[in-house]
Amino acid sequence: MKNIRNFSIIAHIDHGKSTLSDRIIQICGGLSDREMEAQVLDSMDLERERGITIKAQSVTLDYKAADGETYQLNFIDTPGHVDFSYEVSRSLAACEGALLVVDAGQGVEAQTLANCYTAMEMELEVVPVLNKIDLPAADPERVAEEIEDIVGIDATDAVRCSAKTGVGVPDVLERLVRDIPPPEGDVDAPLQALIIDSWFDNYLGVVSLVRIKNGTMRKGDKIKVMSTGQVYNADRLGIFTPKQVDRTELRCGEVGWLVCAIKDILGAPVGDTLTQARNPADKALPGFKKVKPQVYAGLFPVSSDDYENFRDALGKLSLNDASLFYEPESSTALGFGFRCGFLGLLHMEIIQERLEREYDLDLITTAPTVVYEVETTNKEVIYVDSPSKLPPLNNIEELREPIAECHMLLPQEFLGNVITLCIEKRGVQTNMVYHGNQVALTYEIPMAEVVLDFFDRLKSTSRGYASLDYNFKRFQASNMVRVDVLINSERVDALALITHNDNAPYRGRELVEKMKELIPRQQFDIAIQAAIGNHIIARATVKQLRKNVLAKCYGGDVSRKKKLLQKQKDGKKRMKQVGNVELPQEAFLAILHVGKDGK
């Protein structure tokens, strides 16, 4: 056991985590050169296309160190995006150490910091690595100072490497073996295994990734899930050497996969403890804290026949992604669907794309909203995650919106732009610290503004140099109103949005104008209105298509023309009473773009 090393690779987006893991796999001979491809561990098509890691992946490798010993390395490649920080914290729970990869050109960024603090809270050994030293812009001396200054770990002798060219990667492995402690645990104690991750395989059922904390798990054992008390048979178990390899047992301290023929998706939840049925452990391992979704949106299948498939697909996805929350919802405009909770907008996009690709569904998304805390006039407190659930205005005593604490790291020259952006997003500055050329800014900004498009705007205003990490701070009373959209004086529930009173007239007007462009013209006038309560704040009309009924009257009496025009008018009026308006998918997405043009 003293030769096992469990570690994760943590870093900011694009600092080279996945490339470094490729090199490590190559050096340890996990794959032949023929099977080697860029980003071996990003197995989803989506991950490859976007060039980001979404799911944490684990690999077991054998490394022959300079001291002649052979070490077993279990390592986990983690995502770098804010939205997937939950994946990172789960991976870290299975390790004794972490490689903190920092780009020697870019320096320390917000996500580097956030992930590093997570690792330190879990009391892991953090090994700093300076990557991309082959770049002309690389300045390892400055970055090493930055790491000490901002993160607070000693980086004077940080390993320098270039994952792309492979220079210095063996040094990284040597440092790993030297600095990261071996796992602790008792081989003879009753089995305790932590489920780090699980996914659904159409042939095998639920496949779980486990870290053995105590004891040994053998093939054919009866395994008990501690939270439910269910007993399963361990049919197959093994390790990933990126490829799935079968083993007969997993020993204390190892990380591997397990198949128990669990068909029920909720059979083995992530963060649960597995033990032997004959000789169970006394207590479960401390699991993971539940993450609260920050953004909610309605997802509806385009054709209602897909509803069943959609429900199954969500079930399978939520097994793989423990932070996804969903509950059934019905809308008068869109029929039956689900209200889903996500960790951020990127997470929402990814989930929607995965559903459409992996499960072949066509989906409509409504505009994302955050959770509001509402105190009603009879002193009840309710949480509202959808504009249609908001009680009528005169029943609301106080509406509180969630405030996010945003930590930003940026070069000094962009400070002015970023502060202007934060103020425009109704932010309040709470802290500002200078580290050399970098500035660390802390702002409290309403969550609704952060999740909408703050990240994109922050990147564009700072030419991509600023980085952001945010977390929920508290609820704060605020003057928010619901803007409803009426089409031919009927409310469309899927188009409502909650916004600040000061912005409501602009948002309403902009939304109405957008809708006017998107709704196709019909045989009768369509009135589009935006309203707060019963007060109409904006209106636009999609003009009717009309036939020229006077074309056949050359000359002739004026009363004849009047009669024909009146007849057309009456016909249109009748049509308007019975006609209904088909809304295209783009209309529902129009809300997403309201306020994007710097309003």
UniProtKB/Swiss-Prot annotation:
Topology relative to the lipid bilayer, per the entry, is: Peripheral membrane protein
Positions that bind GTP: D14, H15, G16, K17, S18, T19, N131, K132, I133, D134
Subcellular localization, as worded in the UniProt entry? Cell inner membrane
Write the Enzyme Commission number(s) for this entry: 3.6.5.n1
Q: Does the record bear Cell inner membrane in its keywords?
A: yes
Kindly state one GO CC term assigned in the UniProt record: plasma membrane
CDD domains membership = EF4_II, EF4_III, LepA, lepA_C
What GO molecular functions are on record for this protein? GTP binding; GTPase activity; guanosine tetraphosphate binding; ribosome binding; translation elongation factor activity
* Catalytic reaction annotation: GTP + H2O = GDP + phosphate + H(+)
Supply the alphabetized keyword list: Cell inner membrane, Cell membrane, GTP-binding, Hydrolase, Membrane, Nucleotide-binding, Protein biosynthesis
Read off the InterPro entries from this record.
Answer: EF-4 (IPR006297), EFG_III/V (IPR035647), EFG_V-like (IPR000640), EFTu-like_2 (IPR004161), G_TR_CS (IPR031157), LepA_C_sf (IPR038363), LepA_CTD (IPR013842), LepA_IV (IPR035654)
Q: What does this protein do?
A: Required for accurate and efficient protein synthesis under certain stress conditions. May act as a fidelity factor of the translation reaction, by catalyzing a one-codon backward translocation of tRNAs on improperly translocated ribosomes. Back-translocation proceeds from a post-translocation (POST) complex to a pre-translocation (PRE) complex, thus giving elongation factor G a second chance to translocate the tRNAs correctly. Binds to ribosomes in a GTP-dependent manner.
PANTHER family reported in the protein's UniProt record: TRANSLATION FACTOR GUF1 HOMOLOG, CHLOROPLASTIC, TRANSLATION FACTOR GUF1-RELATED
UniProt-recorded name of the protein: Elongation factor 4
Species: Enterobacter sp. (strain 638)
Gene of origin? Answer: lepA
